[in-house]
Design a protein with these regions (language model features):
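Short alpha-helical segments that sit at the start of domains
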Residues: 1-14, 60-62
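Residues within the helices of the helix-turn-helix
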Residues: 15, 26, 44
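Alpha-helix N-cap/helix-initiation sites
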Residues: 6-7, 21, 36
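Short amphipathic alpha-helical interaction segments
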Residues: 34-45
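A short, conserved structural fragment
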Residues: 47-57
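Short, low-complexity interaction segments enriched in Ser/Thr/Pro/Gly
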Residues: 3, 33-35, 51, 67
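Minor-groove-contacting beta-hairpin "wing" of winged helix-turn-helix DNA-binding domains
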Residues: 58-70
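Short acidic, hydrophobic short linear motifs in intrinsically disordered regions
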Residues: 19-31
Length: 70
């Protein structure tokens, strides 16, 4: 995914965050028609750029849930 595609997808993710305060990787993947790996990379790139914040919810055992917020 080049920089232009990342910026376009980032704008769509920001519009998704207007309606929902929290997003999961699967939400972004289904909305943008990406596989989960590309959606995860896009969201991590957005975290590194400072657009969004990442929160990790730990469950019993080794289960983690990544939640992305504004």
């Amino acid at each position: 995914m080049n920089k232009f595609e990342k910026e376009v997808n980032a704008n769509q993710v920001m519009m998704m965050l207007v309606n929902n305060t929290q997003l999961r990787v699967s939400d972004v993947a289904s909305k943008l028609y990406l596989n989960k790996d590309k959606a995860r990379r896009l969201l991590d790139w957005m975290v590194n750029q400072g657009y969004i914040k990442k929160k990790i919810i730990k469950y019993v055992g080794n289960a983690n849930l990544n939640i992305y917020t504004k």
